[in-house]
Regions:
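Cysteine-centered nucleophilic/redox motifs
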Residues: 67, 83-99
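Bacterial Sec-dependent N-terminal signal peptides
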Residues: 1-23
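Short secondary-structure boundary/capping segments
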Residues: 1-3, 82-83, 122-126
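Short glycine-centered, acidic/aromatic-flanked micro-motifs in structured strand/loop junctions
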Residues: 30, 69, 78
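Periplasmic OmpA/Pal-like peptidoglycan-binding modules at the C-termini of bacterial envelope proteins
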Residues: 20-40, 44, 52-64, 97, ...
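N-terminal glycine-rich FAD/FM-binding segment characteristic of electron-transfer flavoproteins
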Residues: 47
Length: 166
């Protein structure tokens, strides 16, 4: 049976999931796109995942690697979309080079802002105004438009204005 390895990049980093095999997190410095093996535990996580990629590819069971990447909500939305795509590109090149897998089996999806990850982090925290932040994350659309199609409000705006921006 062929196996599919999934690779997820989350928030300022990434989550690697090898279906039925293993998982690992890859982190990025804020605003950066290049894989940095010296940042946090990236070296250990990448070495382990690359070993799995090599093994699965060597046995012919590796069918596909999917990279999904995200960025934190700070900064402009368009820049976060571009950053998440560039992180996916960078990681693909890194995996192809170090694991020796063909680039044709790697697909990428830059997802922009990691709203779900932010929600999980807030829910697990003891931060001030946690309930209000969760309410905004759960009930406010990313963008709110007026009748003319202009953006008049949104999730990020409400978060930044919550309690006077504290």
């Amino acid at each position: 049976m062929k196996r599919i390895l999934l690779l997820f990049l989350l928030f300022c980093g990434g989550y690697v999931h090898a279906q039925e095999l293993d998982s690992a997190r890859i982190h990025y410095r804020q605003g950066h796109r290049n894989v940095d093996v010296l940042f946090r535990d990236n070296r250990t996580e990448l070495e382990r995942f690359i070993r799995i990629l090599r093994e699965e590819h060597g046995t012919g069971r590796l069918e596909n690697v999917v990279i999904r990447s995200w960025a934190s909500p700070d900064g402009a939305n368009r820049l976060n979309e571009v950053l998440s795509k560039r992180r996916a590109d960078s990681l693909k090149a890194y995996l192809v080079r170090h694991a020796g897998i063909p680039d044709s089996i790697v697909s990428m999806h830059g997802e922009g802002i990691a709203w779900d990850m932010l929600r999980r982090m807030v829910a697990a925290s003891d931060m001030l105004y946690k309930k209000e932040v969760l309410h905004i994350l759960d009930h406010t659309p990313v963008w709110v438009f007026d009748e003319s199609g202009r953006v008049v409000d949104g999730r990020k705006k409400q978060l930044m204005e919550l309690r006077g921006g504290r």
